[in-house]
Amino acid sequence: MSIVYMNVMLAFMIALIGTLLYRHHLMSSLMCLEGMMLAMYIFISLISLNMHFTTMYMVPLIILVFAACEAALGLALLVKMFNYYGNDYVQNLNLLKC
């Protein structure tokens, strides 16, 4: 396994650990999720280009679409939460309240 693949997997693992450790604020959780999506995009792009999988050339674009949707929904939730509560603490997100 080359050093590029190792670096991409390390970036994914660091973003995953960041998601687990810094879950106090919603903004830091969203940034770690974006880091994970970016690492997945780079990894799948490298695999599809190096292995010449012609059927997988569209998969990185689909991942980018999902990452953009996730970012838009996350930022909309962040703005709504900040307007309602005045902070971005994840502990304020309670799905049992209606």
UniProtKB/Swiss-Prot annotation:
GO terms for biological process: ATP synthesis coupled electron transport. Its EC number is 7.1.1.2. Its main location: mitochondrion. Gene3D superfamilies: 1.10.287.3510. GO terms for molecular function: NADH dehydrogenase (ubiquinone) activity. Keywords: Electron transport, Membrane, Mitochondrion, Mitochondrion inner membrane, NAD, Respiratory chain, Translocase, Transmembrane, Transmembrane helix, Transport, Ubiquinone. It is a multi-pass membrane protein. Pfam families: Oxidored_q2 (PF00420). The chain crosses the membrane at residues 1-21, 29-49, 59-79. Core subunit of respiratory chain NADH dehydrogenase (Complex I) which is composed of 45 different subunits. This is NADH-ubiquinone oxidoreductase chain 4L. It comes from Hemiechinus auritus. The gene is MT-ND4L.
